[in-house]
Amino acid sequence: MVGNGIDHHPTKAGMVIAWLFDEEAKAVFGPRPMITDLRTGAMAGGSGEQAVLTASAIQMARHYGLPSSTIAGATHSKLPDAQSGYEKCLTVNQSVQAGANIITHTCGAQASLMGISFEAMVIDNDMLGCILRATNPVEVSPKTLSAPEIGAVVNEVGHFLGETATFDRMHSDFLYPEIADRADIEVWEAGGSIDIRQAAARRVQEILAEHRPNYIDAGVDRDLRALLPIELLPLA
């Protein structure tokens, strides 16, 4: 595994060549170390070893003071299940913690990047939001410490729920997942006892039914459809 780092030198060489042609050329150090399961020869993109190699490549970029790009979020699972979740979170979180500037392939990919799942995209969106929230620095200041509010609560009402500072922190300090379940058991059972894959499937159907972005002028859209056999839903 350590020798894998040698393979990153051609990437740096390519950047040097670009700068020889143009000193102002924009270049990103983007190594893609990948792990193979030696029992089968298949890619093991969701493994702990993959997380370590990716982090080491990113740290190499930081050592040289270069902006970095990498891939993370691969899983060998064919479905957006528990294996998919832990493998994706492992490699994405490790890459973020290592300091990657750009991370691709983080959302929706299944079966070692050979397939895409809409449900996985929705689930992974929650996961990625939590990872990014976990990497935000904690701001320590008189305002965030809220010592006067703490003193007032201790000596008076006995709880923070009615405080303005609590309401403000609710909107500034917390990220609320879109589909992850945080209800108590009774509410969950009353809602049909669905798991996250079922919740994601519902959200996918809502998005497909309601989200109709219009990026192309209606006239251009008609001309393209008349010229080419494009089998897409017409613009609303």
Task: Place the predicted regions along the sequence by residue.
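A glycine-rich phosphate-binding loop feature that marks nucleotide/adenosyl-phosphate handling sites
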Residues: 29-37, 71-80, 108-114, 147-155, ...
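Catalytic-core signal marking the mid-to-C-terminal active-site face
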Residues: 119-236
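Helix-rich catalytic cores of soluble enzyme domains
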Residues: 1-101
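Histidine (H) residue identity feature
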Residues: 7-9, 63, 76, 105, ...
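Glycine-rich phosphate-binding active-site loops on the catalytic face of alpha/beta enzymes
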Residues: 94-114
